[in-house]
Every structure is written in C-alpha cells, then in structure tokens.
C-alpha cells in the first residue's frame, strides 16, 4: 500500500481541525457510493446504491455489469449526497475517489466522475487507496484512537493484519497467501448451494439449510 497513493492521511492533514468539505466517491466493486465529509470526520451525508440484486443470479460480481451499473448510478448518487448534505459545488474544497485496488472498469467510472467534478469546480482531486481507506475507517468512527495500532483488514480480495505505525506508515504483519477470507467464504457458499446475500432472509431468521 503506497502511502503517497492514498488520501485519508492527506485529507486528515488538510481537513482535520478545519471546515474543509470533501466530496468522496467510491466505485471499486458493486456499490456506487458518495459522501460529503467536513473536517475529516463530520459525515454530512452518505449515499450507497448496492448492486447485490443485480449480480445475485450469477453467484458473484460480474465486472462488466458492475461498470455499466456504476455509469447509470454515479450522477444520481452524487447529486443525492450533495442534496442531503445541503451543499453545492461552490462549497466543495476537494473531490476524492477510490483509485484502487478494485475492478478496473468500476474504478474508472468513479475516478472519471470525480476528476470531472474537480475540474468543473476548480478544486483538487485526491486519489484514495482502497485499503488505506479501510485502515482509517476506525479513526473515522473514533477520532480519539491513538497510533500505533494493529488493524485487521478484511475487504473483498484482501485479508491482512496491519500495524499502523503512524499516518502514512504501515507494516503488513500477515496476510492470506491465496484466497482472502471473503473469497473463500463465497466459494464454500457456492459449493454448498447457499443463496446469494440478496436472498438470505433478514431479521435473524436462518436461511434454508443453515447450519
């Protein structure tokens, strides 16, 4: 995870303790998401459009289908995030977007939209490393957490134990060598004939054949 390729720490330095307003865009896999965040931790809005129903019949995410769905959803999702935050482009100080890891086609949609908005509003575009953003999620939840700390990162194709020594300084203590936890879970579920997440009953009721 190259520290200079990600923005949480950069935005932390620029926005923490200030009123800097950042529009964040995420399209790394099968969710189109946008959020407006002030001062690094104050989430004014967070809009997520899931494609889980769209991919259910395939037993997993289909990259091409995901990319096309992002193309259709990116503008309304961003617009809704800004409306819910009560802001317009004149108040945005920077636009951030996930640039990887992730599905290439899906990432391109979010990055292209973010760069276009940044250019239109004449504000900086900030590249976000997907994995580094996950590390910083804990700090978003509790800004008072102190470094160094050990983080268990489980996201899609990545499962690793990371030591956050300082902002932008990380050491991978261990990681899966082949399939990540999520991938292994999906493969076993398909082998057992388990339903896709979209078909799993909600409310604590076990699905058919649940162990």
Cite the ranges covered by each PLM segment.
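A short helix-loop
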Residues: 2-20, 28, 35, 154, ...
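N-terminal beta-alpha supersecondary unit
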Residues: 10, 17-91, 97-101, 108, ...
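Short Gly/Thr/Asp-enriched flexible loops that form oxyanion-binding sites at enzyme active sites
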Residues: 97-121, 140
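Short, acidic/small-residue loops that bind anionic groups at enzyme active sites
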Residues: 114-134, 174-180
């Amino acid at each position: 995870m190259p520290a200079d390729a990600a923005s949480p720490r950069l935005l932390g330095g620029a926005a923490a303790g200030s009123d800097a307003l950042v529009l964040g865009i995420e399209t790394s896999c099968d969710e189109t998401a946008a959020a407006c965040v002030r001062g690094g931790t104050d989430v004014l809005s967070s809009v997520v459009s899931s494609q889980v129903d769209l991919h259910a019949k395939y037993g997993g995410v289909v990259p091409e289908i995901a990319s096309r769905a992002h193309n259709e959803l990116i503008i309304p999702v961003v617009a809704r995030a800004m409306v819910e935050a009560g802001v317009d482009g004149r108040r945005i100080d920077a636009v951030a977007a996930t640039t990887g890891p992730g599905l290439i086609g899906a990432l391109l949609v979010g990055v292209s939209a973010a760069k276009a908005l940044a250019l239109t509003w004449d504000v900086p575009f900030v590249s976000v490393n997907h994995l580094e953003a996950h590390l910083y999620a804990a700090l978003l939840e509790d800004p008072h957490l102190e470094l160094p700390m050990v983080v268990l990162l489980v996201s899609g194709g990545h499962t690793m134990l990371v030591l956050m020594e300082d902002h932008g300084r990380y050491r991978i203590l261990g990681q899966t060598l082949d399939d990540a936890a999520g991938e292994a879970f999906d493969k076993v579920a398909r082998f057992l004939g388990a339903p896709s997440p979209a078909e799993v009953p909600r409310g604590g009721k076990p699905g058919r054949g649940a162990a």
